[in-house]
Amino acid sequence: MEYERRGGRGDRTGRYGATDRSQDDGGENRSRDHDYRDMDYRSYPREYGSQEGKHEYDDSSEEQSAEIRGQLQSHGVQAREVRLMRNKSSGQSRGFAFVEFSHLQDATRWMEANQHSLNILGQKVSMHYSDPKPKINEDWLCNKCGVQNFKRREKCFKCGVPKSEAEQKLPLGTRLDQQALPLGGRELSQGLLPLPQPYQAQGVLTSQALSQGSEPSSENANDTIILRNLNPHSTMDSILGALAPYAVLSSSNVRVIKDKQTQLNRGFAFIQLSTIVEAAQLLQILQALHPPLTIDGKTINVEFAKGSKRDMASNEGSRINAASVASTAIAAAQWAISQASQGGESTWAAPEEPPVDYSYYQQDEGYGSSQGTDSLYAHGYLKNTKGPGMTGTKGDTSGAGPETSLEGGTDSVSLQAFSRAQPGAAPGLYQQSAEGSSGQGTATNSQSYTIMSPAVLKSELQSPTHPSSALPPATSPTAPESYSQYPVPDVSTYQYDETSGYYYDPQTGLYYDPNSQYYYNAQSQQYLYWDGERRTYIPALEQSADGHKDTGASSKEGKEKKEKHKTKTAQQIAKDMERWARSLNKQKENFKNSFQPISALRDDERRESATADAGYAILEKKGALAERQHTSMDLPKLASDDRPSPPRGLVAAYSGESDSEEEQERGGPEREEKLTDWQKLACLLCRRQFPSKEALIRHQQLSGLHKQNLEIHRRAHLSENELEALEKNDMEQMKYRDRAAERREKYGIPEPPEPKRRKYGGISTASVDFEQPTRDGLGSDNIGSRMLQAMGWKEGSGLGRKKQGIVTPIEAQTRVRGSGLGARGSSYGVTSTESYKETLHKTMVTRFNEAQ
């Protein structure tokens, strides 16, 4: 706190022109090389030498100091120190003083109670908070004694260390040990309070332990501190309130990083202080707290903003590694899910196909706590053989993993645990009976979905779902479905991950795809979707299996109607995409090459969730996800193109019509009509849902995006010959059209226009040069002659009263350029009215006469 007396200019001259008699400056430089700004008095040296005691201070200064203490005690405030600033040479008061309080609350209460003013010995004094120290780029800080030196000093004011040595970065422990941080007294920088009593013992560390603990961050020490693991809903006021007992900060010192879309903070904030010493002291205080610093129920991690990278590895697995694993596994998941959902007609892979090991995807990832169980797609997973975390063999319906059990008429799928625990979330069980139809008779089969609690952290590799051919007869009893309920996902807490392009959910450990609105579990390599009615995450694989059953049940009705629906396999879709990519490269147009046609779902098919299907989202993101991967890797084919592929559950339930002759015979309007779901009022081509039928029709008629997607959809079903013809037509349209040449060829070249007629007819007389009328002399008909005749002048007489002037008019003569008046050869008697021939003749005559 600063008390400044509003006196005259002479009372405050000591602040700017005082001399400095310290021994380290020598006898040559006796004047102080700075302007004595109102910096914090705690940065002033405490011992000024023996000269300090020689001055006899006046009684008024002592009375002022006692008056300040008396007023503080009358208000019940005990100040830690009251220091009146004096001139070192004269001992006179410099007109201001500092009052240090024990707590920030006492200083604030004192300022508010006195309204920033005080009466001392009949003099009105204004009170202000002490100003911060000069900026670090103006003055330099001594790392040995901690004194702030002015920028023009070549050595430290207190300890005499040269500037080059004092500015070298020392270990943080050495600097903090030499400061008075554990003492909680005067050597603290501005804005920081002393260490509380319980934490002073923690601050007094040995130099070895402190240097070892702070060595990584001391190399990157700066004046900015970062706070990590903030609550997304934490505000600036909550951060300032949590740091109020340890530092005097304002909103200008704290910067909270917010998300542009949600306007919530992204989990971290920066605190910028005036100097590195203040940042180091505040960092030491916050790191020494036991229990650690908490803001809005979240434990905060504090470190230098530009410190070394932290070791992100933890017991439950690295989040960054999980993100890279997720982005690497997506391409393989396209083929694995399609192979896993074939149904009862096919197995996981052909027995004669050579074994393929996909464990190289996990190379150098270190994902999770174990290496064997965390492989993305191990050989046992694809081949239905024994693998890490699996106890069953191929064809064995009972020997499943520890989390998988098969009973009569029940398919049990256990979803692996989420990667992070959610405290206090005890999910309940939600049971719902599901009835299905089989081809042999009317019976009910139930499926049990068991989604483990987020509190479970151990991940185990699950065995794949057995095909429907392994189910017992249709006389199995009915069992209810059990689901684990979870809170509604909070999108505001999601964090964007650049490696995978997904949003990471810190509560469940899942990765969210905003385009397809599906969740990806990096541990179980499964896609999930949120079911609002069941309040749980449902695997997309099971959803596709249900759709496959419904498709098989409704196939008989289709046969009765003599209508056979073709399906696209993954290989056919890949061929369509390659053909479409070739046409785009030829046209050099920027179309989206990851389009896949979608067929409208029939009313009697299975009731799906509000989100899009996982199979379409996976196949659509094939090209985009391949570009996101850091290392390009080719996926081996799981099945040969020559072998006819049976219908697959995931693709057969949601894919469009196949590229066959039967499809080509159908009309374009019929195929385009299937791209609209009138029941749900959704455009399946643009993947948009509308509130009313009128809005959907208006979208189809006016939307440019719909027209562009429709053109892409039409081109995707054209043959190669039609594409070439269309390409040739487009190239012809892109050529330059010379419309002027077309007009000349059609109408001919027009005749040039006739010249404009003159306003006055007849041939005009030849123009006479303006000097020609005076060539033969001036006549008596000019205006000058008439004016002279009016004044009594007669032709042949001279000018003047007595006719003594010139008789003939003065004629203009030409002289040589650059010659002076009267110089020899300057004039040859040539006038401006003479022609070139006459001028040349006179010049030659004049030169001849001068030569003689």
Curated annotation (Swiss-Prot):
Organism from which the protein derives: Rattus norvegicus (Rat)
Amino acid composition bias (Basic and acidic residues), ranges on this chain: 1-14, 21-45, 545-561, 665-675
Gene from which the chain derives: Rbm10
Zinc finger (RanBP2-type): 135-165
Residue positions where Phosphoserine is found in the record: 61, 640, 645, 655, 658, 660, 703, 719, 767
Biased composition annotated in UniProt, kind: Polar residues: 430-446
A biological process term (GO) from this entry: negative regulation of ribosomal large subunit export from nucleus
Name of this protein: RNA-binding protein 10
Record-level Gene Ontology MF annotations: identical protein binding; miRNA binding; RNA binding; single-stranded RNA binding; zinc ion binding
Any one GO CC term of the record: nucleus
Subunit structure: Associates with the spliceosome. Component of a large chromatin remodeling complex, at least composed of MYSM1, PCAF, RBM10 and KIF11/TRIP5.
